[in-house]
From Swiss-Prot:
It comes from Mus musculus (Mouse). Component of the mitochondrial ribosome large subunit (39S) which comprises a 16S rRNA and about 50 distinct proteins. InterPro entries: Ribosomal_mL54. PANTHER family: 39S RIBOSOMAL PROTEIN L54, MITOCHONDRIAL, LARGE RIBOSOMAL SUBUNIT PROTEIN ML54. This is Large ribosomal subunit protein mL54. Its main location: mitochondrion.
Amino acid sequence: MAAAHLLRASRVWARWHPRALPVLRRPGGFSIREYAKKPVGKGGKGGVAAEALKDPEVCTDPTQLTTHAMGVNIYKEGQDVALKADSEYPTWLFQVNLGPPKKLEELEPESREYWRLLRKQNIWRHNRLSKNKKL
């Protein structure tokens, strides 16, 4: 009796209903898979006609190009970001390396960047060597 109450309570707690059980098909019966119908659309062979993609508008105004960061606004509405004076930006922004990455020989051996690059190169070397090994 107590087991029946416990079983019933666990079914209610798990939101399990006897009607939710799958219906067993009869032995020897075939199951047929029905695929969804393809959407009917205008155009070529069996596909929906896609809308042509448009390129963004290109600004050619020289004053707008020199005072605003064009294309930085990610929202549909709103204006582009206005550029500020250099003194309003942090100093580290002008020290960012925009060129090719430094080689291992150019870095100081006591720096964190040196050890990160050394580890990365060792991982690349290990991956290259282990690529040809058989299982």
